[in-house]
Structure formats: structure tokens, C-alpha cells
């Protein structure tokens, strides 16, 4: 007979696999709040000739680009989710050509077929520590509002690597002022999925002019007594694709992550 912990873990894995099956069938939705307790990941796939530059870029910028898995050229499987297909199991993909957004698709199979040497990187995502935040009584506003997390380009440039350069992208969650320390402590125990915030308070210090106009995702309400808290974001690689004019890349659409079979506790330290 399974223990309650084993039963809960099995239910969480089932939820992750069910979510991937929905996305494979064409359902498009932000993944925040889906399969609670399971690790989520950002995705970027680039031609093999750009893979070393990106691996070095991620190594030099681990806060926004914590690598969870690297998938060899041409493969679309990952050890983070047995039987998953990275071409179909993310709800929405972005296609980039010469650093510009060329379109969005819900099935990227044809893109892999047309570019058989794609090397894929899975990058840690802050959605992973949202369940612990909620369990501590800290509301995650975009989940409560049923929308995507707001994300912003900043004026903080990242350390370049090879042909890649670009600015930091951050996600924002409003937190009651008296719970900010708790949010910092909780998220800080998850360094492989961005860890503690990079900034608390005045968005102008990051070069963000208007919180009501995010560059990616949706705006959320900020209630009296709350302060904006900013975390490094796995959309940072997409900013590098844009700034560097990468000839071809496939990424997840912001807020539409790959849900793994790995419990978030795996990345808790």
C-alpha cells in the first residue's frame, strides 16, 4: 500500500503527464499553476553551430539561465520526463529567424524536421517555486487572476558569450511588504530555478517604465501594502536571440512551459 507521500507524488506525476498530453493534443494555455509540485522549464533550441555559444552564455549567466538538461542535436527527448516529446508537449512555441519573431505554433514537429541539427536546452523556471510560496500563504497573483505572469526587459546587460549578448528579463510578483523576506527565503532555496529575487521595489531601478505594460505576459493587480518583487527569468535567452540576430531558433512562448516529471523538491536545497 502506498504511503500518503507516495500517493501524492504519483498524483503529481499523473497531472504533469496529463498536461503534456493536452498540449500534444493542441490545448494552448499558460502553465502557471498546472501540475502543482512539479518542476517546469523554459526551452530554447538552436542549430548546433550556435549551441556552444549558448552553453557558454548560460554558464556565464546562471541566474537567468540555469540549465536543467541539454538534449543532443536532432533529439526531442529529455531525461526530465520519460516519453515526452519536446516538439509537441509545450503548449505554445515561438519561431525566431534572424533575431526576429517569425511566428508561434502549437506543434513544432515540422521545425525540427526542417532543421535536424537543433540542440535543445531546458532552463529552470520560477513557476517551480510558486507552489512553496502558496503553501507559505503568499498569494501568486497571476495564478489567482488566471493569467500569465508579467515579464519585463531590463537595462541590465548580461555577460556576453561568443556571438550572444542581451539584457536580463525578469518576472514580477506582487508580495505584501511584511512577507517579502519570506518570499526571498523560500525562492532562495531553489537556485536551479532562478532562486532569490534580483530586485525588490522600484521598477525604475531596472529600467522598467510601467508595470502595467509588461513586455511579455499579462499585467497583474498590485494591492495596497504590496511591493513588486522581481526574479530573473528564463525568457532572457529570447532577449539574447533578438539582440544577437540568431539565424534560427525555437523557444517556448513566454509563460508556456515544459512541465517535467521531476518534483520541485528535487531542486530544493
Swiss-Prot record:
Statement: the UniProt record of this protein carries the keyword Lyase: yes
Annotated InterPro entries: D-Glu_cyclase, Putative_hydro-lyase, UPF0317
Keywords: Lyase
Regions that span the bilayer: none
Keyword Lyase recorded: yes
EC number: 4.2.1.-
Example GO molecular function: lyase activity
SUPFAM superfamilies according to UniProt: PSTPO5379-like (SSF160920)
Recorded family membership: Belongs to the D-glutamate cyclase family.
Protein name: Putative hydro-lyase Aave_3512
Phylogenetic classification of the source organism: Bacteria, Pseudomonadati, Pseudomonadota, Betaproteobacteria, Burkholderiales
Amino acid at each position: 500500500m502506498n504511503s500518503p507521500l507516495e500517493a501524492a507524488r504519483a498524483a503529481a506525476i499523473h497531472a504533469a503527464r496529463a498536461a503534456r498530453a493536452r498540449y500534444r493534443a493542441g490545448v494552448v494555455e499558460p502553465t502557471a499553476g498546472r501540475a502543482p509540485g512539479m518542476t517546469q522549464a523554459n526551452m530554447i533550441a538552436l542549430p548546433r553551430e550556435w549551441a556552444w555559444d549558448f552553453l557558454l552564455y548560460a554558464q556565464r549567466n546562471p541566474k537567468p539561465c540555469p540549465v536543467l538538461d541539454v538534449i543532443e542535436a536532432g533529439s526531442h527527448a529529455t531525461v526530465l520526463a520519460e516519453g515526452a516529446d519536446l516538439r509537441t508537449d509545450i503548449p505554445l512555441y515561438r519561431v525566431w529567424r534572424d533575431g526576429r519573431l517569425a511566428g508561434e505554433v502549437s506543434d513544432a514537429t515540422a521545425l525540427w524536421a526542417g532543421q535536424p541539427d537543433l540542440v535543445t536546452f531546458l532552463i529552470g523556471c520560477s513557476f517551480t517555486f510558486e507552489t512553496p510560496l502558496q503553501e507559505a500563504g503568499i498569494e501568486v497573483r497571476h495564478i489567482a487572476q488566471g493569467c500569465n505572469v508579467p515579464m519585463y526587459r531590463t537595462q541590465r546587460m548580461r555577460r556576453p558569450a561568443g556571438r550572444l549578448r542581451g539584457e536580463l528579463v525578469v518576472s514580477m510578483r506582487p508580495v505584501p511588504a511584511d512577507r517579502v523576506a519570506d518570499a526571498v527565503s523560500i525562492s532562495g532555496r531553489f537556485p536551479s530555478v532562478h532562486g532569490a529575487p534580483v530586485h525588490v521595489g522600484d521598477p525604475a531601478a531596472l529600467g522598467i517604465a510601467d508595470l502595467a505594460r509588461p513586455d511579455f505576459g499579462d499585467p497583474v493587480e498590485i494591492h495596497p501594502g504590496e511591493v513588486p518583487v522581481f526574479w530573473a527569468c528564463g525568457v532572457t535567452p529570447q532577449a539574447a536571440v533578438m539582440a544577437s540576430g540568431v539565424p534560427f531558433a525555437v523557444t517556448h512562448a513566454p509563460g508556456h512551459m515544459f512541465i517535467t516529471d521531476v518534483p520541485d523538491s528535487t531542486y530544493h536545497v
